[in-house]
Structure formats: structure tokens, C-alpha cells
Design a protein with these regions (language model features):
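Glycan-recognition and catalytic regions of carbohydrate-active enzymes
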Residues: 184-230
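Glycine/alanine-rich phosphate-binding loops at beta-alpha junctions
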Residues: 1
Length: 230
């Protein structure tokens, strides 16, 4: 993403996906960088590389595709506009190949507010997908059931959040523990008992990690056919 009032856009307006001859639509006051352009790929990689050089202890990256592509025109592709979507995604993968090669031990989540950017090629470069911004544990049961039809549990990032406080922290944690467990919740708002339970749950998840992440999966009870699932 690039802000039209940024130094980057002022210096390289042709690096953004847009057609100067048409009214430009801004999503979150931004445009999408044209990753079909090798120069843009080099720039994006350099940003990550500089971050790692300046902060070698970075332990995690979240790559968030926070905008649909709206202004459908690539200044770089010129008369090959039919290639734009494909070449743009290939450009993302070219960047990720370099990141993965040079920083293989840094896990990376691919996010799009949901599963819109999840595919098998991306599994080569990202350690996990953010399945949905909907973290209601009841609805996540259906999301994770469906997502697991196509991707393994280790590819699904599942976080305990404050969404749907009508459910217990235990229930929220149990649902998230089916996948790659994480927490996006204010610890100061949790009781001592809840904190103690979560600490125990994390220890158990780590102990059971080989089975959860790499074990064989058997579908026993569908949430679509019952009020529980297994």
C-alpha cells in the first residue's frame, strides 16, 4: 500500500496501480503498489531487509493484504493489462521467496481480513494464514471446520480474543487450540483464574503440538449436523 501524499508516491507515481486518465478511488486513503513491476518488488524487499538489519531480533511478520485492487491499470505492464492480476501475485511471491531464503527462521502470517489471499503457493513462504477477522469462537468452529477441508491445522492461525464475551475464556481457548494458538486479548481484563487457565492451556498446547500440527485428522462430528464438533 502507498499513501498518495507520501514521498514514495511523489517520486514514483507509476509504481502504484492506477490510471491517471480516470478518477482514482482511494481505499483507506491509499493505493496498491504494483508488484508486477520488478523495481517495486526490489523496493518492498528492501523495506523488509532494512527492518531486519536494524532490528535483528524481530520474531514475527504479519503480511496484511489490506485492500482490494480497485484502479485496474498497471503503468508497468502497458499493453499487457490482461496479465495484471497474475503478474501482481507472482511479484508478491518473488518478494516472499527472497524473504524466505534470507530469513527462513522468521515465521510470517498472511492476512487479508479473511481467507481471500490463501492459496497453496503461499504455503511455501508463509507459516500461517489468518482465516478470518471473525474471532467469535462459535462461528470459528464453522470457519475452522471448513478451512481444514483444504489446509492443515498448522496453516490456520486461531487467536483467543474478547469477541463474544458470553462465552468463557476456556471455550474460546479450547476452540483456538485446534489450530495455531495465539492471544489477542487484554490481559488486564482477565481474572486470576482465567490467566491461570490460559497459562495451563498454552503449556498443554505446546505438549500436544506434534499431534495438533502434524497429526492425522479424523472428522467425527460435524457442527452442521450437531450442536458440537470433533
Amino acid at each position: 500500500m502507498v499513501n498518495p501524499k507520501s514521498e514514495l508516491f511523489e517520486q514514483h507515481p507509476d509504481w502504484a496501480i492506477h490510471d491517471e486518465n480516470r478518477e482514482i478511488y482511494y481505499y483507506r486513503n491509499q493505493l496498491v503498489l504494483d508488484l508486477s513491476n520488478p523495481k517495486v518488488q526490489d523496493y518492498v524487499y528492501s523495506v523488509i531487509e532494512n527492518l531486519m538489519k536494524e532490528n535483528p531480533d524481530i520474531a514475527f511478520f504479519k503480511w496484511d493484504c489490506n485492500s482490494p485492487i480497485t484502479n485496474i491499470y498497471s503503468p508497468y505492464l502497458k499493453n499487457k493489462q490482461g496479465n495484471m492480476y497474475i503478474d501482481h501475485i507472482r511479484g508478491i511471491y518473488n518478494v516472499m521467496k527472497r524473504v524466505n531464503k534470507n530469513y527462513p527462521d522468521v515465521p510470517m502470517m498472511l492476512c487479508s481480513g479473511g481467507g481471500a489471499r490463501c492459496d497453496y503457493e503461499a504455503l511455501k513462504y508463509f507459516t500461517e494464514f489468518w482465516c478470518s477477522d471473525n474471532t467469535d469462537p462459535i462461528e470459528r468452529i464453522y470457519i475452522q471446520w471448513g478451512f481444514s477441508q483444504f489446509f492443515p491445522a498448522k496453516a490456520m492461525c486461531a487467536h483467543v480474543t474478547s469477541w463474544n464475551k458470553n462465552t468463557s475464556v476456556k471455550f474460546r481457548t479450547d476452540v483456538a487450540s485446534m489450530c495455531k494458538l495465539g492471544f489477542d486479548i487484554g490481559l488486564k481484563d482477565m481474572s486470576a483464574e482465567e490467566l491461570e487457565y490460559c497459562q495451563t492451556a498454552v503449556s498443554n498446547w505446546k505438549r500436544l503440538n506434534p499431534a495438533i500440527m502434524d497429526g492425522d485428522q479424523y472428522r467425527l462430528v460435524s457442527p452442521y449436523e450437531s450442536n458440537h464438533m470433533a
